[in-house]
């Protein structure tokens, strides 16, 4: 079928033929995420997915949505767009596994000043890679041109996921008690939170060349370190949940330790963490030094090298860590549960 073209719409700043070209370029990446549960292909009004609940007594759907924030500015300055989609997927799927759910489908939304097909395809390439890492299918998406509202070379990216969990297996912290062990799963870097402060620390908007600098203690340029994709923890964490009773999971995002760890704690329980036990990457030390940021603000803003924490009974800790290591996670004991409230960094 011949594709339509509107000269009037193009004159207004929206090139629908660029949209067609984007879809053609991204098809190869989307195909990597397709499974036998996916019905139909790209181009429908909705993404169809056949839900297989075999083995579940009472399936419950869980949804999550998020974006990448101003990490996008780093991608734009470096003109590297093929990993930022991984971040988008990670921010969504890492949230839903905190309830014990398996992500099933993902959808993305890209708003841009001008649809440049090659750039859009690179973004979706990253989204598809994130879906492969998470074991979910990219069943739909939207790319919207916003001429006159956004500069031509800028874009925003957000995503949405739906997962499923058996109601009896929804994560429950009711058995959490003092003595339980908190396990850390290392991050790949800053992940996708705190970039407004990062940009201020290094004055990136006014001095983008700083992204090419390799600071003392770091083994790569600042820009490369900042753009490292958010780690996706779905498969290793679900593997642990299959064999060990996990009492709590926190995805360490905006708000750092102080805001996110308490979200999985039982009332009357606190997380006691020795600062000396936190394996802090050099990037965070550089950020703290360059910005003159207090230790409290660092732990209250950034993940400090810990992207996710799990809480288990002490007798299950070694087994949980072994499973995580078998799935490529360099997990370690971060702290313990004590009586109290919130997070105690000692």
Task: For every predicted segment, state its role.
Residues 2-12, 28, 119-137, 150-157, ...:
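Glycine-/charge-enriched secondary-structure boundary and capping motifs
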């Amino acid at each position: 079928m011949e594709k339509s073209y509107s000269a009037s719409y193009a004159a207004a700043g929206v090139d629908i033929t660029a949209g067609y070209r984007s879809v053609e370029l991204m098809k190869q990446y989307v195909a990597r995420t397709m499974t036998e549960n996916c019905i139909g292909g790209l181009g429908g009004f909705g993404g169809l997915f056949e839900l297989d609940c075999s083995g579940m007594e009472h399936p419950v759907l869980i949804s999550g949505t998020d974006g990448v924030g101003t990490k996008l500015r780093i991608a734009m300055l470096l003109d590297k767009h093929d990993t930022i989609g991984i971040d988008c997927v990670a921010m969504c799927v890492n949230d839903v596994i905190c309830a014990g759910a398996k992500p099933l489908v993902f959808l993305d939304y890209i708003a841009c000043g001008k649809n440049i097909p090659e750039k859009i395809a690179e973004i979706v390439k990253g989204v598809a890679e994130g879906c492969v890492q998470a074991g979910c299918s990219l069943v739909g998406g939207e790319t919207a041109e916003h001429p006159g509202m956004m500069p031509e070379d800028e874009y925003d990216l957000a995503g949405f996921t739906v997962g499923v969990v058996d109601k009896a297996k929804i994560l429950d912290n009711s058995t959490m008690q003092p003595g339980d062990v908190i396990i850390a799963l290392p991050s790949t870097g800053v992940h996708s939170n705190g970039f407004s402060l990062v940009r201020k620390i290094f004055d990136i908007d006014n001095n983008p060349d700083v992204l090419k600098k390799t600071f003392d203690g770091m083994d790569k340029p600042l820009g490369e370190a900042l753009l490292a994709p958010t780690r996706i923890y779905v498969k290793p964490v679900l593997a642990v949940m299959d064999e060990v009773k996990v009492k709590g999971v926190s995805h360490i995002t905006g708000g750092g330790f102080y805001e996110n760890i308490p979200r999985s704690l039982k009332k009357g329980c606190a997380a006691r963490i020795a600062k000396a036990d936190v394996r802090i990457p050099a990037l965070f030390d550089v950020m703290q030094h360059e910005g003159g940021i207090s230790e409290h603000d660092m732990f209250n803003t950034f993940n400090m090298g810990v992207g996710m924490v799990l809480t288990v009974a002490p007798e299950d800790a070694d087994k949980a860590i072994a499973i995580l290591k078998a799935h490529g996670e360099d997990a370690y004991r971060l702290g313990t549960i004590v009586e109290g409230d919130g997070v105690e960094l000692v």
